[in-house]
Amino acid sequence: MPSFLQEHCLQLSRVIPPNICEEIIQIGKDTYTEYGQIGGSEEGIEDHYTRKSGVAWLDRDAKLSDGLTIFDHITPHVRQVNEEFFKFDLSFHETYQFTTYKYDPDRKEHYSWHCDGHHTPYTEEECKNDPLINERLNTYRKLSYSVNLSHPDEYEGGHFEWTDPFGLNPQTMTPDNITYRAEQKAREQGSIIVFPSFVYHQV
């Protein structure tokens, strides 16, 4: 059973088998990686103050050694959480984003405070390169999730933190209210953190 992380995020601990996590990591490494961008369009911008991390876009239908796809392994768990707790009307699933955070002596890789949700529906410009454009157009991102593919002994830092839905102070871009940090079991390999896309969070 999933357990609440405070009141805005839910975790499922170790639901993806370690060997499947390692396979997904290898697929990510074999896929072209670029610096993650910010902004709501296909022509986003690189802003390393806000976001410095590697990003690759994964084929959700890529077959793994057990004959199932990445999509098959992850989305049933997320759907169950949504059906039991959040109850969003979900109409489509976006492309998987494989993100890496590497140690940099000058500036550690990170993704500072942000929310995934759009305040306006997706436009044709934003969807033009998406094969699922007809499903995505004029919709909103409602539910987000983060899958921890790495074993906790293999890295330091990388803490998932979030604040309440009131979000950030627009002057300081920092939370006015309490900040929460995911507990250790959310860092276990194969764990998933599920949260509404309007929740501000950082890594």
Language-model segments: what does each one mean?
Residues 1-194, 198-203:
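Fe(II)/2-oxoglutarate oxygenase catalytic core
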